[in-house]
Amino acid sequence: MASLRGVSRSARALQPFSAQFAVRRCASTQTGAGAAAATPKSNIPDLAELETRSALDAPIPSEEDKKEFRPWKRAADRKARLPSSRYQYHPPKYNRGPLHPIQSPPSSDPIARDFVPGPFNMPRLKETFRTVMASDLMTLAYIHTPPGTPKKEPTERLRAWEGDSPYFANRARRAPRGAPELPIRERDISFRNIPEIKEITVSTFVPLGLKNPDLLIVARAVLLAMTGTMPEMTRSKNNVVQWQLQANKPAGCKTTIYGNAAWEFMDRLIHLVLPRIKDWKGVPASTGDGSGNVQFGLNPEDVQLFPEVECNYDMYPAKMIPGCHIAIKTTATSDRQAKLLLQSLGVPFYSN
């Protein structure tokens, strides 16, 4: 390859210069009375080497020159590839802080390490929610604040140390009661933070899978058909004799779907599965973890109603299809907002 490049360079050196470059001369090399009369000589030695003619005076290319100028034809006739640049940018593997001179590109950049292509489609339920239901949800949760109303400072929820000990001064406040962390505060819904579905986790518990491994295989195949993602096996943490569980042994499987896949799963669940459940009251109103997440379960008979399972029903043994638990994680900050979101999508709730 290097020898070919040397031959091309020597061939270009032997080619005579064209008349186009020979006509244009510098001011210092111009000779003749006509050139001396037409071109005023500069008294400044630094400007003597400058060209006096402008590039705007160059002749306009003719039609023949335009037809002969075909760069695409020259590229097509080139048999060997041009040498590529040796420099290739690789994003950093670790993020060393905002002050480091080398920063990771944003996740939307195709060269980023965490780049995820897409989205490739718009789910029907997601489009309906954003165009129709989002404005209604924001109107239902609207809280009017008159102009000029001073903002209330949030109260301190952590307890201070009380006593005469001098070590209590400037000491961090006490931990909350009943939990290692404080629950999140409920934020008012505005056009900036309308609740949406963030992710959905589908899990199943198969306590008899230790004796009959086929139950775990069927459960994993059912979750794979329902969600379109490969489930991971879950293991029991402790020994439970009543449920025939052993520590660190497979006891079920789970999978989590995000983004458009979560909206499509929710669409099938609301419009194809839940309406066909006989004598189903709905989701208990007492469900929720206080942070905007809602959980409910389905029986084995209800799981069979999913279209992905129903179309290949003969592939799964009827008595081995398990039930499942569905945990819907939303961007809401309270159970009230999460239930309001799911009710607008079509999930019924009931209270005893």
Swiss-Prot record:
Its main location: mitochondrion. Residues 63-80 have a biased composition (Basic and acidic residues). Keywords: Mitochondrion, Ribonucleoprotein, Ribosomal protein. GO terms for cellular component: cytosolic large ribosomal subunit; mitochondrion. Residues 28-109 are annotated as: Disordered. Pfam families: Ribosomal_L5_C (PF00673). GO terms for biological process: translation. It is found in: Mitochondrion. InterPro entries: Ribosomal_uL5 (IPR002132), Ribosomal_uL5_C (IPR031309), Ribosomal_uL5_dom_sf (IPR022803). One of its GO terms (molecular function) is RNA binding. It comes from the Eukaryota. Component of the mitochondrial ribosome (mitoribosome), a dedicated translation machinery responsible for the synthesis of mitochondrial genome-encoded proteins, including at least some of the essential transmembrane subunits of the mitochondrial respiratory chain. The mitoribosomes are attached to the mitochondrial inner membrane and translation products are cotranslationally integrated into the membrane. Belongs to the universal ribosomal protein uL5 family. Component of the mitochondrial large ribosomal subunit (mt-LSU). Mature N.crassa 74S mitochondrial ribosomes consist of a small (37S) and a large (54S) subunit. The 37S small subunit contains a 16S ribosomal RNA (16S mt-rRNA) and 32 different proteins. The 54S large subunit contains a 23S rRNA (23S mt-rRNA) and 42 different proteins. Unlike bacterial L5, uL5m does not bind zinc. This is Large ribosomal subunit protein uL5m. It comes from Neurospora crassa (strain ATCC 24698 / 74-OR23-1A / CBS 708.71 / DSM 1257 / FGSC 987).
